[in-house]
Amino acid sequence: MVERKASVERNTLETQVKCSINLDGSGKARFDIGVPFLEHMLDQIARHGLIDLDIECKGDTHIDDHHTVEDVGITLGMAFAQAIGDKKGIFRYGHAYVALDEALSRVVIDFSGRPGLQMHVPYTRASVGGFDVDLFQEFFQGFVNHALVTLHIDNLRGHNTHHQIETVFKAFGRALRMAITLDERMAGQMPSTKGCL
């Protein structure tokens, strides 16, 4: 089997991001981003997606976390696009429901080649541990735009904001895991009647 790995480096005047992924990993993760709550959520993607993730970022967090969070999403999306290759043989679609105490979220993903994000998370607080939760919209938009996926995120219930966000990221990891899994019956075939994605 061809290794589905990628290493991407993206440098701007605002951030310098390095991202390495292995889509057929075991969930190992290492982060040096400088935004602890984001690192905690990225760990959920790795663990629940069984994706090895190594991300470093030096960003202008002395201003705020916006550029760092968005650019990590962009770079992760670029790495996914590179590692997934031509998409032959993958399931393509993935979905997951995840509960954490009172919170319940659903994530559906399609490696369609068309970027699209529908994110509906009615946060009950504006921040968690000093982290502006609205920035997760920027993270997922950056990912979607560069991984070229259609992504639907819905928090169905919950009143603890940390739980709301954590269920989203766990469900995202599990949906990714399903979508990128290789289907033996589809070996070498494109998962589309168009013949391309």
Curated annotation (Swiss-Prot):
Name of the protein in its database record: Imidazoleglycerol-phosphate dehydratase
Enzyme Commission number(s) of this protein: 4.2.1.19
Main location: cytoplasm
Annotated source species: Pseudomonas putida (strain GB-1)
Listed InterPro entries: IGPD_sf (IPR038494), ImidazoleglycerolP_deHydtase (IPR000807), ImidazoleglycerP_deHydtase_CS (IPR020565), Ribosomal_Su5_D2-typ_SF (IPR020568)
Matching SUPFAM superfamilies: Ribosomal protein S5 domain 2-like (SSF54211)
Keyword Cell inner membrane: no
Top-rank EC class of the record's enzyme: lyase
MF annotations from Gene Ontology: imidazoleglycerol-phosphate dehydratase activity
Family designation: Belongs to the imidazoleglycerol-phosphate dehydratase family.
Lineage top rank: taxon: Bacteria
Keywords for this protein: Amino-acid biosynthesis, Cytoplasm, Histidine biosynthesis, Lyase
Catalyzed chemical reaction(s): D-erythro-1-(imidazol-4-yl)glycerol 3-phosphate = 3-(imidazol-4-yl)-2-oxopropyl phosphate + H2O
Pathway terms, separated by semicolons: Amino-acid biosynthesis; L-histidine biosynthesis; L-histidine from 5-phospho-alpha-D-ribose 1-diphosphate: step 6/9
GO BP terms: L-histidine biosynthetic process
Cellular component terms per the entry's GO annotation: cytoplasm
Compartment list: Cytoplasm
Lineage summary: Bacteria, Pseudomonadati, Pseudomonadota, Gammaproteobacteria, Pseudomonadales
CDD domains per record: IGPD
